[in-house]
Regions:
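C-terminal motif of bacterial Sec signal peptides marking the signal peptidase cleavage site
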Residues: 6-10
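A short, solvent-exposed beta-strand micro-motif common in secreted/extracellular proteins
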Residues: 73, 81-100
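Structured interaction patches on ligand/partner-binding surfaces of diverse proteins
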Residues: 92-126
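Structural motif
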Residues: 16-18, 29-45, 153
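A short, amphipathic beta-strand motif
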Residues: 24-33, 73
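Short, acidic Ser/Thr/Gly-rich low-complexity loop/linker segments typical of extracellular
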Residues: 55-74
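Structural beta-strand segments of beta-rich domains
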Residues: 22-26, 142-146
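Short, ordered, surface-exposed loop/turn motifs in non-cytosolic proteins
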Residues: 35-60, 159-163
Length: 167
């Protein structure tokens, strides 16, 4: 028993982390390229995903854990290490990274940024649909009622030219 406790006490579990706590911030928004309006979405794992890949940490860069936009299309992460990152968002819009089913690149609209202090990144995207409130939502007897108008945001031709080559 004594030997087990001595070996446990000497292990690396009790050493301090050799890195300072990350203090840099990335924040921004995902907006409609045509209207400038925020892209409204579900919040959480069904919404817009933000993916960071630190490019200057190692040759075999791996993705940081993904995080998600708020329902209004804005995002913020206040615990990032300073460095150069590739930033990408995925959601209900024409994908920023597109390639054929054979892996041939068609487009890469991600952003490479230096994150130091507070860094803002705005993505202008082409949503598949636009959702607009018609009038104001009302509340009656604890029930919220809202009317919305949903319209196609990109033409069929644009969809075919951007998405169909992906397979």
């Amino acid at each position: 028993m004594l030997l087990a406790s001595m070996s446990l006490a000497s292990c690396d579990l009790f050493e301090m982390d050799n890195y300072e706590e990350p203090k840099e911030t990335i924040h921004g928004a995902v907006v409609d390229a045509e209207t400038g309006d925020s892209i409204l979405t579900d919040q959480g794992s069904e919404g817009i995903r933000v993916r960071l890949t630190q490019l200057d940490y190692s040759e075999n860069a791996s993705h940081n854990p993904d995080f998600y936009c708020m329902a209004d299309g804005s995002f913020q992460n206040t615990k990032i290490f300073e460095g150069y990152y590739n930033v990408r968002v995925d959601g209900p819009f024409i994908p920023l990274v597109r390639e054929t089913d054979q892996g041939v690149p068609l487009a890469n609209e991600t952003k490479d940024v230096k994150i130091k202090g507070k860094t803002e990144v705005i993505f202008k995207v082409k949503p598949f649909l636009r959702v607009e409130f018609v009038g104001y939502p009302t509340v009656s007897n604890g029930q919220i009622t809202a009317k919305v108008k949903v319209t196609r945001a990109i033409s069929r031709d644009e969809f075919k030219s951007c998405v169909e080559p992906m397979g």
